[in-house]
Amino acid sequence: MTTRKCNKFRKTSESEISLSLNLDGEGKSNIDTGIGFLNHMLNLMTKHGFLDLDIKAIGDLEVDAHHTVEDIGIVLGKALKEALGNKEKIKRYGTCFLPMDESLAFVSIDISGRAFLVYNCEFTVDKVGDMDTELVEEFLRAFAFNSEITLHTKILYGKNNHHMIEAIFKALGRAIKEAVLIDEKIKGVMSTKGII
């Protein structure tokens, strides 16, 4: 099987990000974004997705975390797209309902080549740890649009905002794991068009 790995580096006036992704990993991560809560969420996503992910990010956190979070989503999305190559034999779709104590999250993805985000998540606080809760949507949008996937996410219910966000990231990891699985029964790509 072709190695499905990608290394990316992106530098702007707002952030500098180096990233290494292995789709066929063991759930190992080495993540330093400068944002403790985001580190925690990406570690969880990596573990549940059986990805190997290294990220070193330096951003303008003296402004706020927006640029750094969004730019990590951009780089991770581009890395996923590149690591998938021609997308032959991948299952394409991945869906996960994931409970975290009192919270339940739903994530479904389609590695379609069509970038789209449906985001139905509401939080009751502005910040969890050192990250604004509104940045969850910014991260997911940047990730979906740069990986060219369709991504639906919804919080069905919950009270603890940490638990709700944690459920999203764990579910995202599991949905990615399912969608990128190789199925030898698939001839070419999982589309009657012959391309995704």
UniProtKB/Swiss-Prot annotation:
Pathway participation: Amino-acid biosynthesis; L-histidine biosynthesis; L-histidine from 5-phospho-alpha-D-ribose 1-diphosphate: step 6/9
Signal peptide start-end: none
Top enzyme class: lyase
GO CC field: cytoplasm
Subcellular location field: Cytoplasm
EC number per UniProt: 4.2.1.19
Sequence similarity: Belongs to the imidazoleglycerol-phosphate dehydratase family.
Name of this chain's protein: Imidazoleglycerol-phosphate dehydratase
UniProt source species: Clostridium novyi (strain NT)
